[in-house]
């Protein structure tokens, strides 16, 4: 496949683009992460979500430690070409490193952020494999 489509992406000055992962089955927004050119290309080639970690300065395949992979169903580029939407099948039922289904679990209620989704599995058990 030609990679000319990558030239249509409006990368920011750091060479990144925000990537929204949305659950294909439910339509729920799971998370927001960042992709560089290599991450987006690898995602397309592998069929699994691969992001760029701004803190670790490296690629990371979603689920590489937890097993909670995201299988790509479709990829959309927004009207300004500066954000991508990944429609995914979320494996393991959790997208958030906090052990919740999605990262957007805090809702503003009366001037305070309230956690409105339960922890499905403790992060310690996810990343230390202590209960597997």
UniProtKB/Swiss-Prot annotation:
Record key words, sorted: Amino-acid biosynthesis, Cytoplasm, Histidine biosynthesis, Hydrolase, Magnesium, Metal-binding, Zinc
GO BP: L-histidine biosynthetic process
Gene Ontology molecular function: magnesium ion binding; phosphoribosyl-AMP cyclohydrolase activity; zinc ion binding
Enzyme Commission identifier(s): 3.5.4.19
Reaction catalysed by this enzyme: 1-(5-phospho-beta-D-ribosyl)-5'-AMP + H2O = 1-(5-phospho-beta-D-ribosyl)-5-[(5-phospho-beta-D-ribosylamino)methylideneamino]imidazole-4-carboxamide
Known pathway: Amino-acid biosynthesis; L-histidine biosynthesis; L-histidine from 5-phospho-alpha-D-ribose 1-diphosphate: step 3/9
Binding of Mg(2+), residues: 78, 80, 82
GO cellular component: cytoplasm
Keyword Chaperone: no
Cofactor section: Mg(2+); Zn(2+)
SUPFAM superfamilies named in the record: HisI-like
Positions that bind Zn(2+): 79, 96, 103
Domain of life the protein comes from: Bacteria
Cellular location(s): Cytoplasm
CC cofactor note: Binds 1 Mg(2+) ion per subunit. Binds 1 zinc ion per subunit.
InterPro entries: PRA-CH, PRib_AMP_CycHydrolase_dom, PRib_AMP_CycHydrolase_sf
PANTHER family documented for this protein: HISTIDINE BIOSYNTHESIS BIFUNCTIONAL PROTEIN, HISTIDINE BIOSYNTHESIS BIFUNCTIONAL PROTEIN HIS7
Family listed: Belongs to the PRA-CH family.
Function: Catalyzes the hydrolysis of the adenine ring of phosphoribosyl-AMP.
Quaternary state and interactors: Homodimer.
Record protein name field: Phosphoribosyl-AMP cyclohydrolase
């Amino acid at each position: 496949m030609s990679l000319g489509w990558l030239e249509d992406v409006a990368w920011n000055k750091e060479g990144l683009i925000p990537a929204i992962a949305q659950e294909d089955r439910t339509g729920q927004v799971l998370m927001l992460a960042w992709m560089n050119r290599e991450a987006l290309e690898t995602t397309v080639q592998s069929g699994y979500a691969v992001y760029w970690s701004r803190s670790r300065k490296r690629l990371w395949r979603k689920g590489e430690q937890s097993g909670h992979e995201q299988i790509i169903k479709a990829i959309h580029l927004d009207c300004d070409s500066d954000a991508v939407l990944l429609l995914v099948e979320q494996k393991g039922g959790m997208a958030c490193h906090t052990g919740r289904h999605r990262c957007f679990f805090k809702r503003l209620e009366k001037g305070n952020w309230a956690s409105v989704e339960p922890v499905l599995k403790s992060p310690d058990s996810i990343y230390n494999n202590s209960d597997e």
